[in-house]
Amino acid sequence: MRTKWTVLLWMLMISGLLAAQNTANTSFQVKGILLDSLTQEGEPYATIKIVKKEAPAKALKMLVTDMKGQFQEKVPGTGNFVMTITSVGRTPIVKDFSVKAGEKLVDFGTLYIVDASNELGQVEIVAQKPLVKADIDKIEYNVQDDPDAQSNSVLEMLRKVPLVTVDGEDNIQVNGSSSFKVYVNGKPNNMMSNNPTEVLKSMPANSIKHIEVITNPGPKYDAEGVGGILNIVTVGSGLEGYTATFSANVSNRGAGGGAFGTIKSGKLTVSARYNYNYNDQPRNYSSGSQHVTPEAVTENSSNLDYDGSNKGHGSFQSGSMEASYEIDTLRLVTMSFGLWGGGNKSNGSTDYIATFPENINAAPIYSYSAFNRSKSSWYSIDGGIDYQRLFKVKDRMLTFSYKINTRPQTSDSYTEYEIDNGYNPDWADYLNRLKNQHNDGEQNTTEHTFQADYTTPIGKLHTLEAGAKYILRNNSSEDDRFDADDTGKYEYNKDQSSHYKHLNDIIAAYLGYGLKVKRLSGRLGLRYEHTIQDVKYLVGRGEDFTKNFDDVVPSASIGYKLTDMSNLRLGYNMRIYRPGIWSLNPYLNDTDPSYISQGNPKLDSEKSHAFNLSYSNFTQKFNINISARYSFTNNSIENVTRLMPDTEIEGLKNPTGKDVLYSTYANIGKTRYASVNGYVNWNATPRTRIYMNMSGNYSYLEGSEGMRNDGWSLFAYGGAQQTLPHDWRISLNVFGQTPWIMLQGKGSSFFDYGLSVNKSFLDKRLTLSAFASNFFKKYMDQSSTTEGSGFIRESNYKYSRQRFGISVSYRIGELKASVKKVARTISNDDVKSGGSGSGGGGE
């Protein structure tokens, strides 16, 4: 009997120990994602506390959400629990839940957090949201949460974005390079890439959600875009039902307005927006000189000085519509349509006077006045459709996409001359070239793109992606010149006109690999592109030709998460730029006979290699991003100006042998860029934000004929924002820049400042803003210098940047489902942007 009790006692003890051991080893996993209820963006660094319901004072687990608002953690035990999520300035989220024995996962799915709306007496609960996020290959700036977005253009907001600089002339650089591409909602926008300054200057920032700087594009992106990619994500999300926002602005420079709306019905969601702005440009003034250096003086040389002014006005409009339809939980179709563009009109006059280089006190060689009036338009119209297929395996995805884009542009100008009597008779033939003329130009680029992308996880640590693309791109340009006869009638000048087509067939394929092990993540990629270029001349000089390009483009990046709030990133990529229609157009522009310009249709694609290292640390108090970058190119496309007799310019009619400046584009040789960028945001108090975006760039450029230049340029943008009681906000911004370096000279230095105040009403549905910039001085001066063998050319420009006005926006309705977009879509970023500088044709 005693033996039986002993055995039974041992069995009870063993079973108790086993039960206790099983209880101790029992654990489950909690996961989910925390999003801002209005913007649908991840809420970073929110604090999560999990306790037993019967012991709320003792925390079982404490954790924080990551940069995307995601959280995942193991929790011991079973029974009843309480999870509390808190974030500064937010209403806490409290979730009760139970876990039974054997349950391994509690998935909370998507949780939405809202701003705290309670007031304790006269004390408001406020906080500064982080405006910058960093990933292994990109940095994101949250425009929507920046109060300055209510009164600024997108171009002004770009000055705040890390790794982006915008100088006083509104020239944009990404990673220290002016060669970059612009996307909208993950899709390339060629109009923005070709005319970023004009388009972004006209876009209201309150229509933008955030701006991404993709510093190390992976293999799925086209190989083009030396500096990187700017992805502008427009406002397009909210809460279930419908929403619409209306805005208007008026200033001393013009007026504008816009509307945005989203509606959801069943599985169909549609959003649309439209903006229009009219801009009146105050009169600006220009002056300059074009002098021959002593060693280059000949009997055909002259020094030229000029002085002029110009006034104009223009408009810009943009609109887009997106729709998505969920066929089922695994299949999604999206469609999109977009339009961007505008027009400008201007008129002005310039006085020229030429003197002998060796005797500036002698009588002028000649003098004349040129009167110009012009109008132009530029648009980009695109449409696309995407089909996305998900699978039961998480993150496995197949996407098919088609996109069509057309970019029509027109220019129409008249130039009339008045030649003063008393000119030197040796220059009579030269002055006879000054015939009143009418130039009528049309350019267009139409492209069709077909693309397939596939991505799949391999186990828990690996990701594989592959894809293929075909682009059919047709560039066409028609530049017609009409010269006035003695009666004033304009006759078509076929010899000075140019019609040509530039056809591209681009076939590409890529393969990418990703690895993520605990705190370490890395990506490797390889892309192959084959390009067939076919150039045909319909009117004007030039021989038809065909060129083939083969490019193998590698990329690699590695990131290490030092802590939950800081990371280190290292990357390498190779990028290429195919010349665009502006730099290719062979149209010979001799409106100013002393400065003749044209494009170069035989340019090769430009190839650049870049290495970058960056460190980021983002906390509720401090945001810091520091990066260093080095890039080099051995066949950079640059604008080159030379002094030469006009008889050496091929295709120029009625040359006289006089010395003139000839400007074109060429693959010049070597460029080397080294840069250091820093971004700091300090939330000094829950109501005060102080920030600075700065960069230092060293440039080395080397071309043919001994051309070489190097030097440093510095850029800094800083400011402060103060939140006052009752939803008042005030912002002050200042920026400055030293002269930037060019192959044959340098640009100008700048100083700029602005102030804005805004107030929200009606539960933040109504926002009023007042703004002013450069209010102490109406006109700003800038200058640039171009030097070459035998000449120095200086340009001075006086223009108004003074601006003040008011804006208003009002939001109605609510919406819970944003327009769903496929995770992969078409991205064409392979054309080097041109500009409205010296070159043929123009876009």
Language-model regions, residue ranges each:
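Surface-exposed extracellular loop regions of Gram-negative outer-membrane beta-barrel proteins
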Residues: 228-246, 284, 305, 315-322, 532-534, 564-609, 630-657, 773-789, ...
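N-terminal periplasmic accessory domains that precede
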Residues: 110-111, 154-157, 196-198, 213, ...
